Amino acid sequence: MNVGTAHSEVNPNTRVMNSRGIWLSYVLAIGLLHVVLLSIPFVSVPVVWTLTNLIHNLGMYIFLHTVKGTPFETPDQGKARLLTHWEQMDYGVQFTASRKFLTITPIVLYFLTSFYTKYDQVHFILNTVSLMSVLIPKLPQLHGVRIFGINKY
């Protein structure tokens, strides 16, 4: 252990999803959210699954595709200032294990939600729109692209 030394990463945002235990913690947080929503009285199971999916995808969209920059003062001369967390992750390399995990997780949650809502039309449409809103920005073709200038600065 090196006491008193700084981390070796220029931008710690690039490797945060590769930290030990982060994937398990992420899945457990989704499970905890679901259990908390299940504990609300008079809310049906299909509504809870849809709420779990919508809250997860909203949080994922905000934290990965809307928030830009880094909370650290980095010596990269402002390169990370204009990039979302998704674009910074793994130094922008596509198809890494972390990116695959964060792409597959909402898909698995979508399948579970669709199953437990018994493919109800309203739930299905809400969950599909929510899934597309987090999957489309993850496409490699949209790396660094700001559609209609949204989130440009």
UniProtKB/Swiss-Prot annotation:
Plays an essential role in the homeostatic regulation of sphingolipid de novo biosynthesis by modulating the activity of the serine palmitoyltransferase (SPT) in response to ceramide levels. When complexed to SPT, the binding of ceramides to its N-terminus stabilizes a conformation that block SPT substrate entry, hence preventing SPT catalytic activity. Through this mechanism, maintains ceramide levels at sufficient concentrations for the production of complex sphingolipids, but which prevents the accumulation of ceramides to levels that trigger apoptosis. InterPro entries: ORMDL. It is a multi-pass membrane protein. GO terms for cellular component: endoplasmic reticulum; endoplasmic reticulum membrane; serine palmitoyltransferase complex. This is ORM1-like protein 3. The chain crosses the membrane at residues 22-42, 43-63, 95-117, 122-142. Ceramides bind to ORMDL3 N-terminus and stabilize it in a conformation that physically restricts the accessibility of the substrates to their binding sites in the serine palmitoyltransferase (SPT) complex, hence inhibiting SPT catalytic activity. In the absence of ceramides, the N-terminus is flexible and permits substrate binding, thus liberating SPT from inhibition. Keywords: Endoplasmic reticulum, Hydroxylation, Membrane, Transmembrane, Transmembrane helix, Ubl conjugation. Residues 1-17 are annotated as: Important for ceramide level-sensing. The keyword Phosphoprotein does not apply. Residues 118-121 are extracellular. Belongs to the ORM family. Ceramide-sensitive subunit of the serine palmitoyltransferase (SPT) complex, which is also composed of SPTLC1, SPTLC2/3 and SPTSSA/B. The gene is Ormdl3. The lineage of its organism: Eukaryota, Metazoa, Chordata, Craniata, Vertebrata. It comes from Rattus norvegicus. The modification Hydroxyproline is found at residue 137. When hydroxylated at Pro-137, ubiquitinated via 'Lys-48'-linkage, leading to proteasomal degradation. In endothelial cells, ORMDL3 proteasomal degradation is controlled by the sphingosine 1-phosphate receptor signaling pathway. Residues 1-21, 64-94, 143-153 are cytoplasmic.
